Amino acid sequence: MRNDGMPSRAFFPNIQAARAFAALAVVAYHMHVLPFGQAGVDVFFVISGFIMSWVAPGEGRMFFRKRLVRIVPLYWVTTLGIYAIAVLRPQWLNSTTAAPEYLIKSLLFVPYVKENGHWGPLNLNGWTLEYEMLFYVVVAASLVGVRARFATAFAALMLASFCLWAAIDGTPGTVAHHLGQPIVLEFGLGVVAYRMLQTGFVRRIATPAWVLAACVAVAAIPLSHALFGTPQAFARIALWGVPACVLIVSLVALDMRNVSSGNRLVVSLGAASYSIYLLHPYVIGAADKIAGLHPDLLTWTGFVAACATLGVVCLSGYLCHIWIERPMVSALNRKLGPSA
């Protein structure tokens, strides 16, 4: 047991399973077979807030470097690969322009507006990493200014203040206004999840209650989508962020009671979720262009295409994880020191 009331375990199998299903939900959304699948991003952000609250106090001034080692290598590799395709085979991509300015901004996690009028870096899913990097920067600064155990809570407060400013007085269309979107509050929900689990009330609630809470949280997302459609701005925090927070609290509570996912495939996909997340739009596009796979759950051929595409996405993401992502991170850790 750590001195903050949390168990000393460094790995939560249920969180890894949540990562797997969150990544697959986003994949299914981009396959146009799961209209609420983008809620996987909300789950990722809450997980990030929880995990950073877990690791930041022990990492101190090494926190930001460790986050860079974990996030940057694969993102840069995929970004450079997409840029090369945009230069050599632009017809393979839809809205990606091979401008050096866009490459530099993408590599530095600086948001920009593309020719189609949408915000987004060269890697289509890199927009979420811009918010992740903002959170990491604020946490790293907080570790310098406040006690380590309060750093993520202070960072969440700063992001909430930034979000409030963007909503009240921000200038639409600016980078600051874009980064101040309400979705950044979900990192704070992850911090709340961590603080709730610190209180010790977890052990006073029976296991079936936590299972029920997790099921209700998962069901709340498609239910809210069926009733209200895709929520925007602050409504998204209430309708998708809060259930994601309840889900993470429930899953970690179950881990703490040794009720954990033992499915090796799910845990492996969770470990590969970052690779799956960054690669899948291009794997889906390639499956469409090369094999003519058009996912559609309303027809048998479309259902088979959906299963085949999902399988190819999972396999390519897993291979990328074990052949590219993990070796790069390990090599950097050997040179720079261990990373969490």
Model-derived segments and spans:
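Membrane-interface helix-loop-helix regions
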Residues: I47, S53, R65, I71-M133, ...
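Flexible, solvent-exposed coil segments and beta strand-coil junctions
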Residues: V27, A166-D169
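Conserved functional loop/turn residues at catalytic and ligand-binding sites
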Residues: R67, P327
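Short, solvent-exposed turn/loop segments enriched in Gly/Ser/Thr/Pro and often Arg
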Residues: A39-G40, A84
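Structured binding elements
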Residues: F44
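Alpha-helical transmembrane segments in multi-pass integral membrane proteins
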Residues: M1-I15, F21-G37, S53-M62, Y112-P121, ...
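Hydrophobic residues within alpha-helical transmembrane segments
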Residues: A17, F21-L24, G40, L68, ...
